[in-house]
From Swiss-Prot:
InterPro entries in UniProt: BRCT_dom (IPR001357), BRCT_dom_sf (IPR036420), DisA/LigA_HHH (IPR041663), DNA_ligase (IPR001679), DNA_ligase_AS (IPR018239), DNA_ligase_CS (IPR033136), DNAligase_adenylation (IPR013839), DNAligase_N (IPR013840)
GO biological process: DNA repair; DNA replication
Natural source organism: Vibrio vulnificus (strain CMCP6)
Database matches in SMART domains: BRCT, HhH1, LIGANc
Annotated catalytic residues: 116
Source species taxonomy: Bacteria, Pseudomonadati, Pseudomonadota, Gammaproteobacteria, Vibrionales
Cellular component, GO annotation: cytosol
Keywords annotated in UniProt: DNA damage, DNA repair, DNA replication, Ligase, Magnesium, Manganese, Metal-binding, NAD, Zinc
Enzyme class: ligase
The protein, known as: DNA ligase
Domain BRCT: 593-669
Its job: DNA ligase that catalyzes the formation of phosphodiester linkages between 5'-phosphoryl and 3'-hydroxyl groups in double-stranded DNA using NAD as a coenzyme and as the energy source for the reaction. It is essential for DNA replication and repair of damaged DNA.
Residues that, per the record, bind Zn(2+): 409, 412, 427, 433
Gene for this chain: ligA
Cysteines paired by S-S bonds: none
EC nos: 6.5.1.2
Amino acid sequence: MSESKQQYLEELKQQLHYHAVRYYVEDNPEIPDAEYDRMMRELMAIEAEHPEWISVDSPSQRVGGVALDSFRQVTHEIPMLSLDNAFSDEELESFLKRAQDRMPSAHIDAFCCEPKLDGLAVSLLYENGVLVQAATRGDGTTGENITENVRTIASVPLKLQGEGWPSRIEVRGEVFMPKAGFEKLNDIARKKGEKVFVNPRNAAAGSLRQLDSKITATRPLAFYAYSVGVVEGISLSSSHYQRFLQLKQWGLPMCPETKLVNGLESVKAFYADILNRRDALPYEIDGVVIKIDDIVIQEKLGFVARAPRWAIAYKFPAQEELTLLNDVEFQVGRTGAITPVAKLEPVFVGGVTVSNATLHNADEIERLGVMVGDTVVIRRAGDVIPQIVSVVKDRRKGDEKNIIFPTACPVCHSHVERIEGEAVTRCSGGLVCQAQRKEALKHFVSRKALDVDGLGDKVIEQLVDKEMVETPADLFTLSAGVLTVLERMGPKSAQNIVNALNVAKETTLARFLYSLGIREVGEATAANLARHFKTLEAIQTATHEQLIEVPDIGEVVARHITAFFAEEKNQRVVQALIEQGIVWPAVEELGSEIPQPLAGKVVVLTGTLTQLSRGDAKAALERLGAKVTGSVSKKTDIVFAGEAAGSKLTKAQELGVEIQTEQDLLALL
């Protein structure tokens, strides 16, 4: 029973990781927020029951959301966490009870309440009153530098007003697009025959992620502050609400609906009032945020892995509509998972037109009792992601058709299998399956794997469709001349891809393991395997018993690893990759005997490094004991400056921070 539950936990992790990427990176979610939240709460409940099963790559240990490659990355000095959700008065009461139980001597009665804006979380850094950096939340630890775009937002002060502001302060808040501005933007797009945005949130996110800030400047964006991060120079009020008022005096806008209330009943009344006036408000919201007002209590309550214990988002009820289920298509993912996708009569619900919804698996189809031709209830839980929640069976006409789950893969026609205890049906074709092949190759060249610049999804799909590659090793046999037969592929672009493939041959053992796409082996697990076994050969021949000795590897993951390397076709792929020249440096022994000359030092990398990639340099510095951050401050001990170093180098010089060169870094290594 315990093994079955742990296996289910691993499946939950996989699903949560997948849907987080669909939501935060691809902007193409498959399931409603409510379903994601349910899965997350189920995962956290199992982990609470079995804390020994918690792994570093668990979704409970991080904030959803991944920084894109288009912008320079920024490391948040204090993580920008997300919020836990409540969907009922009972869950709100449980949140408050947990807080009070943790601090029995405190009287928790004052709460700062505000609408939960449906936009994009950002961080604004002011130094000596001047805006010097703006960043997205990203994954909570690392975000995107969007300073030039944020400077175009009229409600964001470029310089703080008044007096008495800290020498350094980070203000966090939400960038959003008011309803009126959104409608006007879409009206202009329609008149020009251009594509319109589906909702204000997407419009705000798309506007902030423009590489050309002149485009952002034309978009009707607004900003409201909701909290403070780093503060240096002065002490702020011990009241969260009073901090809001102080920010307002310095020229930072706050949501006018924000209130300080006393007592649980007042919190509920605030929620009911905002819900009642929701449609009349000039901006989109999907709930209210409730924060314990006392900063001292906040600090003592602290955080869980992904959210503060002193705040919660009380979400509004999901919005629902009726529509017809016209058909069901079956999609195949990288690991062979076959997912039924409902094709719906388009319906406008929760601010977007919905035409697709996931049906998850065969069990879900059976549970719903849904048939093609049924009238179904579509819900957009959290106002973001659609799902089929029920069937209106009394509207059936008698010509509805059963949904037949395929017995063979819809792409490669290999037989499908469903392992006992799993809800997912999988194609057994592996890389023989064109769908799996495409997804496996996309994973292989992705940023966190081999990181092949320029080899995007559309290029991979063409290569597979034209039968130019079958396995990852085939990529390294491509010539520029061969690549030019692809659509929109000129000689220069083709040569750039060949060059990028050659550069990617020099990697690390951890990246190589991750690139292979072994089920459940994410970045952290791959790194643990590399550190533990040191060589690929040792991992390939490791027994199940040896594998479960590795930190964060349990029975299920160990089975996936041994099964992968036991497959002859996988052995051939790995060998072919080695023969193509993929190499990595020896994995260093980690332990007290390894000197850490930078132990406890705060280090910043800036400029262009010629001998190391930025990622490799960061990893090397961390092995030497350093904490690598993304911005220079008084707390910075060393700045390693490469070629064309800019503002960070200038700031380091102004602050008197020690500056070293790339050669100094190489000497340390």
